[in-house]
Amino acid sequence: MTIEPLNLVRIRRQFHESPELALKEFQTHALLLSVIRSLPQNLLEIKTIPELPTALLVRVAGSHPHRTIGYRADIDALPVNEKTGLDFASKTPGIMHACGHDIHMTVALGILEYFANHQPQDNLIFFFQPAEESHSGSVRAFNANIFTNQFRPNEFYGLHSTPTLPAGVIGCRMGTLFAGTTEVNLKLTGKGGHAAYPQDANDMVVAQAYLITQLQTIVARNVNPIEGGVLTLGKVSAGNVRNVIADQAVIEGTIRGLTQKMILLIQQRVQQICEGTAQAFNCQVEVKMNQGGYLPVENDPTLTHELIQFMQSDSAIKFKKTPPAMTGEDFGFLLSKFPGTMFWLGVGATSSLHSATFNPDERAIQLGIDAVIKFLQNRMSKGA
C-alpha cells in the first residue's frame, strides 16, 4: 500500500478554520487522529485518555533506544473574532487560532510523519495537549498519570510560534523563556450607606484606591530592578449609584515573574498588603490567587545549551538568541516535572499573537519541521 505524504499546509488550514476552545477540542482531536492513522502504523502506538478526552499521545518505537524523548504541541484556540479575511478563516464566530496552535500541531504532525517513515534511534512521544490557553491542560494531563511506563519521557521539547522572528528562524535562550503567571482576584467588603453620611458607612471605593496604590509599590520597592517581576491590576469595579457609598469593591489582576521565587515573593506581598488594608480600613479583603500550571518556562541548562549549539552550527538553520517573554505558557509545568527545552519558531506575521489579524507565514511550517528533525536526530546520536 502506498501512503501519500501529508499535505501539511492543507492540514494547517483545516485546523485554522475549525478552532475550538480549551477542553472542547473534539473536532481537532478527530482530525489529529485521522491524520495520524493515515501514517504507517508499524512503529506507532496511539493512546487516548478518558480523563482528558481531547488529549492524544503517540509513541514512535525506537530501533535502539537509550531514552524516550517527548515533544508537545498545544491544540486549543482563543475567544477571538477573526478579522484576517483569509479564505480559510475561522468558521466559528468568536473563536480563532490566534496564538499559532494550528502551526504547532502541523509542525508536530510533520515531525511525526518523518519518524513514522524513518525509524528513530530513541523512542519518541508526541503529546497533543488541550487547554494551554486556560484550565492548565498540562497539569490535568500529568495528574491523570498519562506519562507512565512506555509513555514516560526522559526529556521534553516544544516550540511556540512568534511573529517577532522571520519565518523559519529558531529562537531560544538559556534560562527562562516564558514568565510564570498568577491570576489575582481581590474582593473588599465594608458597609454601604448614603453619600451624605460617610461617617455611618465604610467606603470600599476609598479602601480600593488605597489598596491599588499600595500594591503598586511591590514591584517598585520589593523587587530587584534587574529581575523580572510584574503586577498589573487590569480590572476594578465598585458601586452602582453616584450617591451611595459602596459596600463592596473588586480588583482583578495578574502577576508575572521570570522565576518561581519571584512569583512567590509578589504573591506573599499581595497577601500581606491586603491583610494590612483590611486592618487599616476595618473591612474584609478576600484574596484569591491562582497560578495553575503556568509556572515559568525554565529551560534545562544542559539540554538548552546542546540545542542552541546545534541550531547555530547548522548552516541551513537560521538561529537567534532571544530575550525572555513576560507572557505565560503552561509548558512550564511539564518542565518542572521533566528536563527539557522550549524554543521559538518565527512565523513572520505582521500582527501580534492573540490578535484578530494574526496571520503566520506558512513557509515556517516546513522550515520548523526540518530544524526539529535535524535536532532530534543529532540528540539521538549522542547515546545515553
Curated annotation (Swiss-Prot):
SUPFAM superfamilies listed in its UniProt record:
Bacterial exopeptidase dimerisation domain (SSF55031), Zn-dependent exopeptidases (SSF53187)
The UniProt entry, under InterPro entries, shows: AcetylDAP_deacetylase, Amidohydrolase, Bact_exopeptidase_dim_dom, Peptidase_M20, Peptidase_M20_dimer
Q: Does the keyword Hydrolase apply?
A: yes
State the Gene Ontology BP annotations: diaminopimelate biosynthetic process; lysine biosynthetic process via diaminopimelate
EC nos: 3.5.1.47
Q: Which reaction does it catalyse?
A: N-acetyl-(2S,6S)-2,6-diaminopimelate + H2O = (2S,6S)-2,6-diaminopimelate + acetate
Q: Does the keyword Amino-acid biosynthesis apply?
A: yes
Q: What class of enzyme is it?
A: hydrolase
What's the family?
Answer: Belongs to the peptidase M20A family. N-acetyldiaminopimelate deacetylase subfamily.
- Classification via PANTHER family: N-ACETYLDIAMINOPIMELATE DEACETYLASE (PTHR11014:SF98), PEPTIDASE M20 FAMILY MEMBER (PTHR11014)
> Per its database record, what is this protein's job?
Catalyzes the conversion of N-acetyl-diaminopimelate to diaminopimelate and acetate.
Q: Which HAMAP family match?
A: DapEL
What is this protein called in UniProt? Answer: N-acetyldiaminopimelate deacetylase
Q: Which organism is it from?
A: Pediococcus pentosaceus (strain ATCC 25745 / CCUG 21536 / LMG 10740 / 183-1w)
